[in-house]
């Protein structure tokens, strides 16, 4: 079984492909939310915990923010550094496991006006919520998937005689509730907003086969048989150009709190 770092390294190229598509409506709405609620101002100091390839780092740097990026994946950080190169505003990128940090390291000493963690497991309990909050003199923001529907994936698994299963190990609603409870237990007042986020991934038959193998078949003793079976079925499910539209319909929980407002 892959380590946490190996798991994120294995999907770094996928994240980079999404980054190259540019900002989408969901990203824009999130940036507007931060700005309209006074969380984000031009030139403020922001840390992105579990930054991936630095997608939000580039958006924030374009606003003149001083950006610090952290991620457990060395490949993600390598790509993040490449993506941040065009920006002349201050930025730092660090490969680390947030669990191993104290939050008092020199690079965090000045503190941050906004701390974010979007779709990352880095913030997951009272301890990590407190650590994130202690390094922030303003707002903390965590985004987590609350619901995930993927009709084509389910159709393929039904066709293969398999019971559809989620890509996530934990129940998404339970995970979001745990974060909200952790914020409250840490002494802060959690707020939550739930937003729709839908997209479609266009994949070739081979790319969809690899996606299914990586996310659903890899731990099975019959994984190679499942790979061949999926490939055979997908050849009959693609369009005339050999492509597949894999639609994903989700709801995201935006969980946020002000570190200067304690219970």
Task: Describe the residue ranges of each PLM region.
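Class I SAM-dependent methyltransferase SAM/SAH-binding core
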Residues: 53-100
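Short alpha-helix
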Residues: 171-187, 192
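A short SAM/SAH-binding and catalytic strip from SAM-dependent methyltransferases
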Residues: 112-127, 146
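Conserved Class I S-adenosyl-L-methionine
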Residues: 191-263
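Conserved class I S-adenosyl-L-methionine
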Residues: 1-40, 43-52, 141-163
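A short glycine-rich, Lys/Arg-flanked "PGG" loop and its adjoining helix->strand segment in the class I
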Residues: 126-141
